[in-house]
């Protein structure tokens, strides 16, 4: 497997899939994707090294030693993630924490540090935050934003084939190109 993009940032699990700044930025690298070709691997505990996470798991399992495994992860994960992580770990939900083996803990740690999600497609264009494509910047005078092909025709913003990562960059492109076009009309 080849890593196309590695990033750190915020991510949302939604009713339709993954979203948030990290996913929006990564999607630009997958625009020509074939369904099922990409897998996103998430580190659900990026602030912890594997060793630190193992120590945390040991501490939490000891603290909850008489509880069912599925009821012991509420300080580690959001409530809605717990059943998914439990299922992927292969540890029976009703297993008591004090019976979980080192091998089971290693599988759990791997699930937390390498949580995979297969990307099956993009959300519809109607829900897009940023789109790629448009008028080629090679066909536009960058000082005036006037078309090199049709005098008197000006372009600004998302009509241009320019896209950027989230964080206001697309707004800056829109403002700057709009200003340049407006100043040269």
Where are these regions (language model features)?
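Gly/Ser/Thr-rich beta-alpha loop segments that engage phosphate groups in nucleotides
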Residues: 19-22, 135-136, 159, 166-170
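N-terminal low-complexity, intrinsically disordered patches enriched in charged
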Residues: 26-29, 142-143, 177
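A conserved FAD-binding loop/helix module that cradles the flavin
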Residues: 161-185
